[in-house]
């Protein structure tokens, strides 16, 4: 049940139903609001009004003013909520009002609406509005209002509620204290880890600084040596002599390469000349084979006695030339068996007679 101050009105959630109490002022006590709400819902028992701000709750005292308690919250006054809770049965041991008819409406209850009957399947009840002001109405003399509903709450009950509220507050504070102790332990662990990492980084920084100093000293020493070497020329170092030897070797290799290129050019020229000579010899050999076949054909024709047509003038001229050519080259062609192969392949009809003519 939630209460909210809007134009001197309090919005209350009673068992999941929002109700509005009108005519509330700064002098209206919590006890009056609770009695009015209990009479409106037609229930008896012990009720408490709880002030809720976000997730924190505080039980209001009977003589405390809800409007004043809400005003003390300042800018969070609109977020204040009041919850009406039933803590137990009535002290007088009066049976529940559900089993007996409700009392007649008195001047206090005259402004309150009657309790709605529970109808199955009906929609949830809307917010109900009632007024704490007492209109000038004559109460019904038939059934008087029970004194338990309008009587003040005993001081012992108020003290008990105060003690319960203190216990609840102490429990919440203990819970918060345990939470903050855990957070403190976590922060201390994080701080220790951060200090360890800081120490490691400091050690690494010192080590790198020492290495940088050593490298700077080494660089200064090398620069001094270079300056001394540049100012005082001395005997050539091993590097210079090695470079000179490499230059000489390169020059020698270049000369050898030039000589090899010249030799290769001469060899290529000789190869070309040999190729030309071989081609000329092959042509000459073909001409000799052709002339030899002509001679063999003439000899065969003469032996068989056939009339040989007069040779052309070119053939007469070529025969002496072939004989002249054969006479100096006969010694060169003695070991070559190609002439017989060429002569035997002259014609397919002539070979048997040619063999007889050679015999």
Curated annotation (Swiss-Prot):
Keywords tagged on the record: Apoptosis, Coiled coil, Cytoplasm, Cytoskeleton, Ubl conjugation
Pfam entry (one): RA
Entry PTM: Polyubiquitinated and degraded by the proteasome upon prolonged stress stimuli.
Renumbered residue ranges of the record's region Disordered: 87-123, 339-359
GO biological process: apoptotic process; signal transduction
SUPFAM superfamilies in UniProt: Ubiquitin-like
GO cellular component: centriolar satellite; cytoplasm
Coiled coil segments of this chain: 180-208, 242-301
PANTHER family: RAS ASSOCIATION DOMAIN-CONTAINING PROTEIN 7, RAS-ASSOCIATING DOMAIN CONTAINING PROTEIN
Quaternary context: Interacts with MAP2K7 and GTP-bound NRAS.
Protein name, entry field: Ras association domain-containing protein 7
Organism: Mus musculus (Mouse)
């Amino acid at each position: 049940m939630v209460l909210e101050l809007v134009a001197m009105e309090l919005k209350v959630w009673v068992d999941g139903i929002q109700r509005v109490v009108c005519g509330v002022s700064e002098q209206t006590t919590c006890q009056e609001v609770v009695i009015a709400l209990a009479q409106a819902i037609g229930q008896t028992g012990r009720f408490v009004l709880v002030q809720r701000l976000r997730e924190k709750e505080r039980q209001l005292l009977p003589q405390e003013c809800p409007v004043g308690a809400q005003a003390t919250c300042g800018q969070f006054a609109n977020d204040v909520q009041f919850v009406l809770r039933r803590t137990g049965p009535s002290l007088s041991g009066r049976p529940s009002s559900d089993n007996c008819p409700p009392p007649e409406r008195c001047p206090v209850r005259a402004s309150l609406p009657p309790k709605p009957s529970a109808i199955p399947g009906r929609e949830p009840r809307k917010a109900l509005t009632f007024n704490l002001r007492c209109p000038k109405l004559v109460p019904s003399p038939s059934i008087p209002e029970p004194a338990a509903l309008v009587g003040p709450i005993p001081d012992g009950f108020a003290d008990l509620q105060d003690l319960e509220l203190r216990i609840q507050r102490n429990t919440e504070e203990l819970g918060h204290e345990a939470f903050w102790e855990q957070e403190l332990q976590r922060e201390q662990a994080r701080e220790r880890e951060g200090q360890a990492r800081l120490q490691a980084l400091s050690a690494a920084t010192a080590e790198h600084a020492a290495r940088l100093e050593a490298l700077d000293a080494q660089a200064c020493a090398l620069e001094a040596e270079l300056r001394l070497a540049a100012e005082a020329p001395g005997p050539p170092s091993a590097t210079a002599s090695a470079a000179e030897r490499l230059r000489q070797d390169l020059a020698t290799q270049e000369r050898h390469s030039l000589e090899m290129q010249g030799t290769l050019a001469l060899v290529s020229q000789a190869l070309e000349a040999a190729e030309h000579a071989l081609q000329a010899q092959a042509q000459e050999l073909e001409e000799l084979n052709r002339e030899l076949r002509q001679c063999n054909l003439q000899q065969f024709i003469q032996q068989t006695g056939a009339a040989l047509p007069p040779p052309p003038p070119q053939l007469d001229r070529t025969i002496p030339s072939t004989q002249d050519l054969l006479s100096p080259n006969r010694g060169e062609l003695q070991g070559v068996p190609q002439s017989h192969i060429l002569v035997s392949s002259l014609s397919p009809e002539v070979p048997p007679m040619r063999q007889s003519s050679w015999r």
